[in-house]
Amino acid sequence: MTNKKFKSGFVAILGRPNVGKSTFMNHVMGQKIAIMSDKPQTTRNKIQGIYTTENEQIVFIDTPGIHKPHNALGDFMVQSAYSTLRECDVVLFMVAADEPRSTGENMIIERLKKAEVPVILVVNKIDKIHPDRLFEIVADYTSQMEFSEVVPISAKQGNNTERLIDTLSEKLDEGPQYFPEDQITDHPERFLVSEMIREKILLLTREEVPHSIAVTTDQMTRDEETGKIHIMATIIVERKSQKGIILGKGGDMIRKIGKMARRDIEIMLGDKVYLETWVKIKNDWRDRKMDLADFGYNRDDYM
Ligand SMILES: Nc1nc2c(ncn2[C@@H]2O[C@H](COP(=O)(O)OP(=O)(O)OP(=O)(O)O)[C@@H](O)[C@H]2O)c(=O)[nH]1
Ligand SMILES: [Mg+2]
């Protein structure tokens, strides 16, 4: 036992889509809590990653990438992201080193200027640029607003992420351990199962399809005969043509999705899984409040 005071706090990770927010949180947690992909708007809900050591508990809140919404789902995502400003002690504003500052970033910066908590600028993906360019990138952002710290990292390779944790620890006040030490997230297993299926669809499909799907996990029970966990999940699409793409020729695609997702789910649950998936069409669900709520995008989340 050390006689150091226990520190804790909530840390929101904000930024444009695709800058690496979820990759960073998963790296810190040492496991996949939030799904990741090279497609923008991968994360749709706030997701906590609870990082506990003997000296501290940092509750990271991964958020949907802030963008200009084109439907009710987008509205929900952006609202959830901004709502974390009211519930956190520190903000990590993440940008990508390999992309110039855009109007998207400028919009976020205007909001962050009004934040009542310290904002740390995290320049991610430094593995993608020549080190000489870092100075100019940092100078550009710091000319726009005053940040309490600037930390360049590579979330993918893990460069400098420990320094970022140390910097965060310094910023946090003494506080209670909010969650038991073995709790890693605020979402139930069913949510993580749905997300892992959605991740494989993001990986395997293109254009509008990844954005048009939702996944629900309707049942998770242990099959007494086989001893496996029997999971029944539904993939929701917006159009008949999308259903065709998800099923694939002779069911090829859905089998591939199921196989890849099952592997991840088995690792997460530490158990054998039998995954059964169904595909359902719900026209324009992304603009229907009732459907959004049914598929886990509840307004309650940010009100
Ligand atoms: N080269 C490199 N790629 C990275 C790094 N961090 C993330 N990526 C990649 O960037 C892409 C987006 O990563 P995500 O973690 O899904 O990004 P996000 O900010 O959570 O995106 P949204 O959820 O859409 O807002 C993925 O293809 C990652 O592998 C990094 O440090 N270096
Ligand atoms: Mg994400």
Curated annotation (Swiss-Prot):
GTP binds at residues 15-22, 62-66, 124-127. Keywords: Cell membrane, Cytoplasm, GTP-binding, Membrane, Nucleotide-binding, Ribosome biogenesis, RNA-binding, rRNA-binding. InterPro entries: G_ERA_dom, GTP-bd, GTPase_Era-like, KH_dom-like_a/b, KH_dom_type_2, KH_sf_prok-type, P-loop_NTPase, Small_GTP-bd. PROSITE patterns: G_ERA, KH_TYPE_2. One of its GO terms (biological process) is ribosomal small subunit assembly. Residues 153-155 are annotated as: G5. It is a peripheral membrane protein. Residues 62-65 are annotated as: G3. It is found in: Cytoplasm; Cell membrane. Residues 41-45 are annotated as: G2. The keyword GTP-binding applies. One of its GO terms (cellular component) is plasma membrane. Gene3D superfamilies: 3.30.300.20, P-loop containing nucleotide triphosphate hydrolases. Residues 205-283 form the KH type-2 domain. Residues 124-127 are annotated as: G4. Residues 15-22 are annotated as: G1. An essential GTPase that binds both GDP and GTP, with rapid nucleotide exchange. Plays a role in 16S rRNA processing and 30S ribosomal subunit biogenesis and possibly also in cell cycle regulation and energy metabolism. NCBIfam families: era, PRK00089.1, small_GTP. Belongs to the TRAFAC class TrmE-Era-EngA-EngB-Septin-like GTPase superfamily. Era GTPase family. This is GTPase Era. It comes from Lactococcus lactis subsp. cremoris (strain SK11). The gene is era.
